[in-house]
Amino acid sequence: MPIGETQSLAIKLDNTGHRFLPGQKIRIALSTAYWPFVWPAVNNPTLTLAEKPACLSLPMLVNLEEKDVQPNPPVAPPMSAITQKRKPNSNRDVEYDFNENKVKLKIKDDLGKLLYHKHNLVTSAIKHEYYEISNNAPLSSMAQISWSFEYSRDNWMTRTITETIMTSDEKYYYLKAKVRAYELSLIHISEPTRRLV
């Protein structure tokens, strides 16, 4: 997009539905950043909204009759017998480090540990995510994600652990990954590093 020039843009909002009552207002916020879902732009851009001819066009649903969208919904098969050996748990922590001028986001999603009685398989999955960025320094961005999957039955057990780190500079994204595979003990390890444009 050209810098310093006025551009005419049409932005389609996520499909959603809302009923506005008389007197209610809607507010829209525009941003050049959506960290950590979208990697930040290198030059820390700014956005100015021209007052005219900015407009918001909302579609209106005129016929408010209820519709049977799916008259014959699919029927799921019966649940197999499962025992929960570890409850799922999810944590999200945001840390503001004022000394380093950084924002850190830590996410842990433990999907639990389950025993499937039909085939006596035990499954477990845990995900860790860590993101950090310095204020007004988009090149300081770092994302780190790891997954641990475990499958076991009787005296047999396999486990995989994946770790991925992403950083960037003005030209490239850098991906560093590590995969470890276990069958009772470590049997495979791989550590590729890639530079992407």
Residue spans for each PLM region:
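Glycine/threonine-rich phosphate-binding loop and adjacent beta-strand/alpha-helix elements that clamp
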Residues: M1-S190, R194
